[in-house]
Swiss-Prot record:
Belongs to the ferrochelatase family. The gene is hemH. Its main location: cytoplasm. The keyword Lyase applies. It is an enzyme of class 4 (lyase). PROSITE patterns: FERROCHELATASE (PS00534). It catalyses: heme b + 2 H(+) = protoporphyrin IX + Fe(2+). This is Ferrochelatase. It comes from Cupriavidus pinatubonensis (strain JMP 134 / LMG 1197). One of its GO terms (cellular component) is cytoplasm. Pathway: Porphyrin-containing compound metabolism; protoheme biosynthesis; protoheme from protoporphyrin-IX: step 1/1. Its EC number is 4.98.1.1.
């Protein structure tokens, strides 16, 4: 095996500490070609689909991708941002805004840290962002997946890709991983403030009359729970802590799971049938919030805000509210900073003074270094 050459070393260059925010990914454009390319990478990951490759890949390439690429492209088209200050995939736009906001906040607090965002599938890739950090002289990297609840299908595959990339480097940085933050007080407080701010603007559900808050998390196959994945338990804990923070009784909110794919049983109860059932019984108002998604994306903006509303209203429901994800709201950015800072304890968080860097460079040149 050959290892990639390192960038030319600059004596006196300040070593950097970076925070790498990692999210799932998104196609480059809302077109069948771009969506097909993205889905191919995503659904080819054995962490995502645990089916023997010989059985799965022919089905993926021959049936699923040709059918799903066009249909999914239409869904992406329906949520694609085209505003002057926000253009592109919502997940990428909000992820970049989160990184920039976190960078600003940490700088304001006196920390000289680099914040970058990458996608597990699609662009900007983990490999390309790590390479950019390497060329900046980064020597410590905190990998912070934007998955509050750990799952082998999400968090673990992000870690896998980081290790795969670094396995090709000759000079590797120090690495720390944030496994989860599903019960972190700052995360729960940020969720609480997001829901509270929405209710302050749009009115609070009348829980005494049967209105309900649905907390919808991304689903995974039930088999993963049986094999020891903690995701289900962590979602339930997040839901309980948020319900307690909001002062709700157990019957006033419900944890559900969305985005089921294929015919196998996934974690239940499923979100769409739950919304339809609430519509059938004549629920006056249903609010849906997705605590496991720190940034709005196709699963929230299209699957919940559009399809979910249709499920509920067609079945007989009266009023549907989709509560947006936290995106770059200040309480969430503050929580993200608190989580990150707890995990970089002991690392250099500020640049050495310029005169110290110059002294290092001079000493190296005295000993024969070229630069």
């Amino acid at each position: 095996m050959t290892f990639s050459p390192e960038p030319a070393y600059q004596h006196g260059q300040a070593p950097r500490t970076a925070i790498l925010l990692v999210n799932l990914g998104t196609p480059d454009a809302p077109t069948p070609k771009a969506v097909g390319r993205y889905l191919k990478e995503f659904l080819s990951d054995p962490r995502v689909v645990e089916i023997p490759r010989l059985a799965w890949l022919p089905l993926l390439y021959g049936v699923i991708l040709p059918l799903r690429a066009r249909a999914s492209a239409l869904k992406y088209e329906s949520i694609w941002l085209r505003e002057a200050h926000m253009t592109g995939s919502p997940l990428l736009v909000y992820s970049e805004r989160q990184a920039h906001a976190l960078q600003r906040l940490l700088n304001q607090q006196g920390y000289e840290l680099t914040v970058a965002c990458a996608m597990r599938y699609g662009n900007p890739s983990i490999a390309s962002v790590l390479e950019a950090l390497r060329r900046q002289g980064t020597e410590q990297v905190l990998v912070l997946p934007m998955y509050p609840q750990y799952s082998g299908t999400t968090t673990a595959t992000a870690f896998d890709e980081v290790f795969r990339v670094l396995g090709q480097w000759r000079n590797q940085p120090e690495i720390r991983l944030v496994k989860h933050f599903h019960d972190h007080p700052a995360y729960i407080a940020a969720l609480h403030q997001q829901v509270g701010a929405y209710w302050a603007q749009h009115g609070t559900p009348d829980f005494a009359r049967g209105d309900k808050l649905i907390l919808s998390f991304h689903g995974v196959p039930r088999r993963t729970l049986e094999l020891g994945d903690p995701y289900h338990c962590e979602c339930l804990k997040t839901g309980r802590l948020l319900g307690d923070a909001l002062g709700l009784q157990p019957g006033q909110y419900q944890v559900t799971f969305q985005s089921r794919f294929g015919k196998a049983e996934w974690l239940q109860p499923y979100t769409a049938p739950t919304l339809a059932e609430l519509g059938k019984v004549g629920a006056g108002r249903v609010d849906v919030f997705c605590p496991g998604f720190p940034a709005d994306c196709i699963e929230t903006l299209e699957e919940i805000a559009m399809e979910g509303q249709t499920e509920f209203m067609v079945a007989g429901g009266k009023t549907f509210h989709f509560i947006p994800c936290m995106n770059d709201a200040q309480p969430w950015i503050s929580a993200l900073a608190e989580i990150a800072l707890q995990h970089v304890q002991g690392w250099p968080l500020n640049m050495p003074h310029a005169h110290e860097l110059e002294a290092r460079r001079s000493r190296a040149q005295t000993r024969g270094a070229a630069a």
